[in-house]
Structures are given as C-alpha cells and as structure tokens.
C-alpha cells in the first residue's frame, strides 16, 4: 500500500488552490463539499471559478503565485499546466509540512485525491495510487450504480440510535448482530424508499425486543421485456434481497437468473385461459407471506401497471395494511419496438401511440375501433396473437387501409427475438401459417416501414434468421 487512506477534517480551515482552469474548478468544488475555506490564486480563471468568487463561496486573487501565499494553509492543491510552477508549489509545501496535491504528478504529491462515492455521511474513496485514475473512475461508476442514494439517511438513522443500542447491548457482538439485521432488512428498505418515520418506528420496536412478528413488505417489480440489462438498479436490488419471489410466465430466464440464489421461488404463471394460480389467490398469497415477516418480490414481465394487474394486487395489500413498493419496468411496447428498429412516434408518420390489450377481462375485444382506425398513429396490441384475425377485420371494416404495415415481435429484446412484417390484410394468414410463440407484440402503423432502415438489434445477432417478411 503506497498511501495511507485517511479522511481529513478541513471544516472552516484555509485551503489553497493554485490555478483557475476547469480542473482547478473541480478541485475547488471537492474542497467546498468538505466545507473548507478555499482561496484560489491564478492569473486567469474559467468562468465557473469567477462565479464562485462572485458568489462569495471562495476567496479569489487574480495574480501570480508567491511563496508567501502558502502561509497558514492546512492543505494545498496545484492545478496548473505550468510544470515549474507546480514543482515550486510542491517544494514550498513540503518545506512547510503542508499536505500538497499536484494534479497528474504523483511524484510531487504528499497526498492524492481519490474518486469518491458520496452518500454522506457514508463516503467511499477509490484510489489507484495515481497509476490508473481512469480505472478508479470506472470502479466508482460501478459502485455508484449499486449503492442506493439513501444510504446516507440510513447512516443518519443509525447515528440517532447509536447510544440507545449501546445502552441496550453491552456486548459488542450483540450490537454487531443488531446492526447487521437492521442494515440488511426491511428497516433499511423503508429508508431507501423514503419511509423514514416508519423505519424509525420499526427500529424502536426492534430495539425494544418486541416478540410480535414484524410485518414484511411486498415489492411489485417490473422485470422489463426480457433483456436483463434493461432492469432498473432498484429492481435488481429488491430482487436480490427478497426472501420470496412470485413470478409469472413473461419473466425471462435471464431476469430470473438475477434473483437471490436462496430465495423461495413460487411460479404463478399465466397463459390464455389457464392461470396456474388464480389472481385472487395471488393477491392473498402476497398478504399472507408479508404477514409472516417476509420480504416478497412480485416479479412481473414488462411494467406492473401496464396490463400487468399490478393495481389489483396492491389494492389488496393496501386493504390489509401491508407496506409495498412499486418499481416501474420498461413495458413490452417500448422494449420490443426499440429492439426492432420501429419508433412508436415519428414526426412524419405518427403523432400518437396507443397501447391496447387484445385479451380483455371478459375474454372479448370490445374496443373503440373507430378511434383505433384513424391515421397518423401507432397501435400496439398486447396479448392479441389469438385475436389477430378479429382485430384485422375490425380495423379494416372501420376504415384502416388493408395495406397498413404491421410487425409482430416475438420474444422481444432477447437473443431469441423474431420480427415478422406484413400488412393488416395479410396478418391473419401470417399468424395461421407461421409458428409464432407468445409473448408476441403486434405493432400497427406506418412507422413499421422504418424498420428496414433503423433495425439495429438483429444485425448484432449471430443468426440471420431472426427477421421475417411475410406476404411481400
């Protein structure tokens, strides 16, 4: 280890930055975040540094650096492109035992500034000892994507209870166990979702040692259209901490591969007219599992609030006083159209887009066909594969051109994606003659013609058999 990683308190203490360019500006902001009193010396400065000075956030001297400028400083940063000046600042700082950092010159530094992940009061510093700063920034980016921004609030909550916990548990091992349970459980998740007061109350109950079973929480998570890379950070985090996962047929294998390894998996798959577990039973199962104190992830394909019956499920949770979170997912219409090179709206072809279910609650397709048949719009049908003939006939009957372009996207966003293009008139024959598997989305509109020009995903697939043209 070439450097000792330490954190220095510079609150209200004088810090000097030599230089006024963009890099100096970044270093000044770094020092200001730690509440240092910053003085900047430069013969000329960028507009951002000048603004900091005009806002009285720093002291600014537009002049050349002099040896006397380092007097009474507790920390110095030199951020200029003048090699001899940087060396002078370093030597003077060393002679006066003042910590100094010279940007991009590790040999002239007595300390280096790491990349940081700021979740104050939690701060993570990453350093490559000046060897590979770009790599340090990449590592920082990975950490930024995995650590919830509310970690700081969790630390503050813990700080408020620290003395109480110390008083309750004299043994350090008992305290450690208490905090580990807190930081990895429902209390932490409530903080992350902004329910600070609930988390505070639950922490007090846990500290009091109540024997009452703590009610768990349900996470209604949108698993997206199939590609696991399209999951949100929050979705992934909740999937990996849930005790139980209820999932359905539309969740891809790639997404399922990311759930917590030891979680209990319950399949509640749904197919047309064949629900493995009836919706009412799913609703009640969510309630029962949460009342057992378990963290329950209800994992759905696409977005839970777009033809996903998510509203019905959380209605039941709300009626039973169960805490829940809803995490949006990329809906199939957005994911499948994007991965097929078909924009849902376009200035020249479509000024609106409608998402329509082809499988209504009563099993019929009682839709406003006149509204759906107007020009300059895109229609996306979910769950309509078996009703393709009916929707084709109805749209043509109500005025849509029989030659209107149509695309069917099977298993969209996955390596198994297939895209069939045809016309509205020929759609029934396509579905009849080809072996097309659910989940398949039907996109109708002039925007489909753009696929030939804008298709990008199929070109990345190894096989050329992923795209099909039916009926010329």
Swiss-Prot record:
**Which SUPFAM superfamilies does the protein's record reference?**
NAD(P)-binding Rossmann-fold domains (SSF51735), Siroheme synthase middle domains-like (SSF75615), Tetrapyrrole methylase (SSF53790)
Per the Swiss-Prot or TrEMBL record, the active site comprises 248 (proton acceptor), 270 (proton donor)
Question: For NAD(+), which residues are the binding ones?
Answer: 22-23, 43-44
Q: Where is this region: Precorrin-2 dehydrogenase /sirohydrochlorin ferrochelatase?
A: 1-203
Uroporphyrinogen-III C-methyltransferase, as annotated region: 216-472
Phosphoserine occurs at which residues?
128
What HAMAP family does the record tag this protein with? Answer: Siroheme_synth
Q: What does this protein do?
A: Then it catalyzes the NAD-dependent ring dehydrogenation of precorrin-2 to yield sirohydrochlorin. Finally, it catalyzes the ferrochelation of sirohydrochlorin to yield siroheme.
Q: Which protein, by its recorded name, is this?
A: Siroheme synthase
Q: Which organism is it from?
A: Ruthia magnifica subsp. Calyptogena magnifica
């Amino acid at each position: 280890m070439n450097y000792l990683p330490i954190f220095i308190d510079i609150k209200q203490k004088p810090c000097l930055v030599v230089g006024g360019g963009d890099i100096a500006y970044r270093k000044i902001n770094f020092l200001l975040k730690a509440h240092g009193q910053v003085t900047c010396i430069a013969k000329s400065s960028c507009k951002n540094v000048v603004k900091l000075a005009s806002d009285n956030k720093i002291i600014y001297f537009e002049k050349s650096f002099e040896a006397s400028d380092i007097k009474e400083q507790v920390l110095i940063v030199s951020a200029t492109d003048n090699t001899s000046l940087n060396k002078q600042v370093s030597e003077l700082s060393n002679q006066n035992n003042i910590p100094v950092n010279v940007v991009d010159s590790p040999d002239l530094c007595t300390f280096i500034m790491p990349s940081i992940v700021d979740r104050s009061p939690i701060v993570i510093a990453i350093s490559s000892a000046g060897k590979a700063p770009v790599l340090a920034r990449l590592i920082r980016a990975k950490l930024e994507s995995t650590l919830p921004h509310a970690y700081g609030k969790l630390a503050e909550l813990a700080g408020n209870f620290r003395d109480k916990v110390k008083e309750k548990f004299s043994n350090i091992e008992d305290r450690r166990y208490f905090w580990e349970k807190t930081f990895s459980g429902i209390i932490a998740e409530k903080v992350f979702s902004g329910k600070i007061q609930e988390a505070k109350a639950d922490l007090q109950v846990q500290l009091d040692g109540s024997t009452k079973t703590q009610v768990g929480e349900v996470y209604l998570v949108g698993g997206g259209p199939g590609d696991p890379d399209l999951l949100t950070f929050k979705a992934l985090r909740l999937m990996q901490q849930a005790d139980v996962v209820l999932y359905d047929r539309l969740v891809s294998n790639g997404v399922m591969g990311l759930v917590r390894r030891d979680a209990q998996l319950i399949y509640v798959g749904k197919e047309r007219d064949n629900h493995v577990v009836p919706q009412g039973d799913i609703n009640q199962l969510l309630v029962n599992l949460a009342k057992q104190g378990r963290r329950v992830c209800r994992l759905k394909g696409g977005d839970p609030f777009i033809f996903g019956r998510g509203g019905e499920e959380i209605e039941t949770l709300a009626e039973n006083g169960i805490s829940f979170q809803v995490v949006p997912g990329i809906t199939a219409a957005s994911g499948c159209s994007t991965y097929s090179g078909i924009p849902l709206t376009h200035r020249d072809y479509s000024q609106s887009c409608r998402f329509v279910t082809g499988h209504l609650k009563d099993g019929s397709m009682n839709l406003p066909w006149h509204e759906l048949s107007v020009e300059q719009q895109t229609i996306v049908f979910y769950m309509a594969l078996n009703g393709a003939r009916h929707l084709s006939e109805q749209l043509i009957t109500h005025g849509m051109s029989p030659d209107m372009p149509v695309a069917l996207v099977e298993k969209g966003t996955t390596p198994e994606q297939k895209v069939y293009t045809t016309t509205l008139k020929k759609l029934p024959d396509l579905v009849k003659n080809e072996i097309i598997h659910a989940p398949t989305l039907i996109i109708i509109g002039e925007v489909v013609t753009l696929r030939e020009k804008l298709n990008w995903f199929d070109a990345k697939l190894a096989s050329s058999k992923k795209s099909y043209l039916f009926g010329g």
